[in-house]
A protein has these predicted regions:
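Active-site and donor-binding regions of nucleotide-sugar-utilizing enzymes
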Residues: 8-129
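A donor-sugar binding/catalytic signature common to diverse glycosyltransferases
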Residues: 11-13, 224-265
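Conserved catalytic-core segment of nucleotide-activated headgroup transferases in glycan assembly
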Residues: 160-192
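Short, aromatic/basic amphipathic alpha-helical patches
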Residues: 19-24, 81-83, 107, 201-210, ...
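Catalytic donor nucleotide-activated moiety binding site of glycosyltransferases and closely related
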Residues: 186-220
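Leloir-type glycosyltransferase catalytic cores
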Residues: 272-316
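A nucleotide-sugar donor-handling region in carbohydrate enzymes
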Residues: 102-167, 284, 290-296, 300
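Extreme N-terminal starter segment of soluble prokaryotic enzymes
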Residues: 2-7
């Protein structure tokens, strides 16, 4: 039997792609990605103030899929426009709070820290993603790392957003703390940047750690997966809920490297509190411990619930 097709709509960021692809895989859908771009003026307008039309898109496509999975602000208009045109021929799922009427979607998948509620809303702990433990372990030999009999610490660096600005001072504080805690006589570090990591922060990390440790200077998915496989301990900067959620598939200790927020980060505080209660994360401080927790695999927990909704709508 042919797999049901899904069209994945995002703005092309790693965190969004990870979520839509992870969900489509859990639902056993064949899929293709489409990066959404709105025409110049409309890309700056919030969805709730935007009229719904496919004419706002810089590029249209023929929708030959029964399922639309979207994530991110700019994809909202496209998903709703397709739903208006194709009606019950498609099942549209949006990941994250769309900031518009929930009635525009058949289903919304939203993290608990967003505080969204509705009959067509299913909530998750943290962000859903595409990572699987067996896929991570397959990449363990991708990085040629001499552990030298030491504990391996993977340090995953995010980048600035509206809550964290990655100022030189804050970056220095984090890097100095990591150097002080994870001394080279006991630990071997793998430092991994993300798509959002500024070039100057990557250079600073290289200068700070490359003498004794392995610093990956370019974004490399295989290196990222290998680093998760090799790690005894994982450190993730506090700016990325997606990367912390991805790391939680490993069941390995996750330390969050905190920095000062530039504005009230209520959603982040809720998320950190929730993951601490689940025993997944701890703040990066002076003491280093090893611990384990139950694997967090939200996307596969949700899959049967979503399939039931799709059956009710006659999609499967």
């Amino acid at each position: 039997m042919l797999k049901l097709k899904a069209h994945l709509l995002t703005q092309g960021m790693h965190g969004m792609i990870s979520q839509v692809e992870g969900l489509s895989r859990a639902l056993n859908l064949s899929f293709k990605h489409h990066t959404v771009n709105l025409k110049s003026f409309w890309k700056f307008i919030p969805p709730k103030f935007t009229f719904i039309s496919e004419n706002l898109l810089t590029e249209k496509f023929i929708c030959d899929s029964r399922v639309i999975i979207s994530c991110g602000r700019k994809s909202v208009v496209h998903s709703i426009a397709l739903k208006k045109r194709l009606k019950n021929k498609i099942f549209n799922i949006h990941i994250q709070d769309p900031k518009v009427s929930l009635k525009n979607f058949d289903l919304i998948i939203c993290p608990e820290h967003d505080g969204l509620k509705g009959e067509n809303v299913i909530t998750t702990k943290g962000a859903i993603h595409y990572l699987r433990k067996n896929e991570i372990n397959k990449k363990s030999k991708y990085l040629k790392l001499d552990k030298e009999g030491k504990k391996v610490v993977t340090v995953i660096i995010g980048g600035p957003n509206k809550y964290y600005d990655y100022s030189e001072n804050q970056t220095n504080i984090i890097f100095n703390k990591i150097k002080t805690i994870f001394t080279p006589d006991k630990y071997k570090l793998i430092v991994i940047p993300s798509y959002r990591t500024p070039e100057d922060v990557v250079r600073k990390a290289f200068n700070a750690f490359s003498h004794n440790h392995l610093v990956i200077k370019d974004v490399d998915k295989n290196a990222y997966l290998a680093s998760l496989s090799l790690a005894d301990i994982i450190v993730v900067t506090c700016d990325s809920i997606s990367m912390i959620s991805e790391a939680a598939i490993t069941e390995k200790p996750i330390y969050v490297a905190n920095m000062m927020s530039v504005k009230n980060n209520k959603r982040f505080k809720y998320f950190f509190s929730q993951f601490k209660k689940l025993g997944i994360i701890r703040d990066l401080e002076d003491k280093v411990d090893l611990w384990s927790y139950n694997q967090l695999d939200e996307v596969n927990r949700l899959a049967p619930l979503i399939k039931e909704r799709m059956k009710l709508n006659g999609i499967i």
